[in-house]
């Protein structure tokens, strides 16, 4: 069944199909993720809006049993600051890929669409893209069926303690219960505290965010452990971010 809809959408990626055609994956607000066929993409009027991380209102023909089609578009929004910075672009591409991985095709998820859009808008405004990515990662865990409590001890349920995390018990340990897991993570207590704050943060009121580089490195390492242990996905965009740690700093120094 094919139906016509008008929906805001974010282009996740495109890929070549035959000689001059393209398949374009768009996360739509009204109809979830869909694959759209664009014929003669190089000469098409749609060429400007089928690039990754372009946001627009689309007039679409949606097909539940096959490829869908883009009929028209308006109110195009791009992210020039994101696109002009390799590092920000890498993280923006990763959060979009993470949203893609967390959601089945054709499944509507307007809250996730809004959250992804707001994350990109805050990156565009210049807020710390690494921290925004951590916030996105911790929130989207529920889409993978994972719910973690960083607010209280798994054993005594006390709050406000210098928590560590235990993968054995799937939760936090207070100092009185560190001994329950000899292989606990030995985290800086600021890490569980921050993740607890991230879980309840409201992006609509977020104006600034700043963390020391050492804390950001610890957050990145722990989030990688969480995703490896509980989610088990290995995205190309995440591998690229990891490679930035090796050669990205050299690039930054050359551009000074």
Language-model segments: which ranges?
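Non-catalytic alpha-helical scaffolds and adjoining flexible linkers that form interface surfaces
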Residues: 1-256
């Amino acid at each position: 069944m094919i139906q016509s809809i008008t929906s805001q959408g974010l282009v996740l990626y495109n890929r070549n199909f035959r000689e001059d055609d393209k398949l374009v994956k768009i996360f739509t607000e009204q109809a979830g993720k869909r694959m759209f066929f664009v014929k003669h993409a190089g000469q098409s009027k749609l060429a400007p809006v089928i690039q990754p991380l372009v946001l627009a209102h689309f007039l679409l023909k949606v097909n539940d049993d096959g490829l869908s089609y883009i009929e028209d578009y308006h109110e195009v929004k791009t992210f020039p600051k994101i696109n002009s910075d390799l590092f920000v672009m890498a993280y923006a591409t990763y959060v979009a890929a993470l949203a893609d991985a967390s959601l089945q095709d054709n499944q509507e998820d307007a809250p996730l669409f809004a959250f992804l859009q707001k994350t990109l808008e805050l990156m565009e405004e210049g807020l710390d893209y690494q921290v925004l990515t951590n916030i996105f990662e911790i929130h989207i865990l529920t889409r993978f069926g994972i719910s973690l409590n960083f607010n209280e001890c798994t054993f005594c349920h006390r709050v406000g303690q210098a928590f560590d995390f235990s993968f054995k018990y799937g939760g936090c340990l207070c100092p009185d219960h560190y001994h329950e897991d000899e292989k606990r993570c030995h985290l800086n207590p600021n890490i569980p505290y921050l993740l607890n704050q991230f879980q309840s943060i409201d992006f609509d009121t977020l104006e600034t965010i700043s963390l020391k580089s050492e804390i950001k490195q610890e957050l990145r390492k722990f989030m990688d452990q969480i995703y490896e242990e509980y989610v088990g996905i290995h995205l190309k965009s995440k591998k690229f971010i990891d490679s930035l740690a090796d050669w990205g700093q050299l690039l930054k120094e050359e551009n000074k």
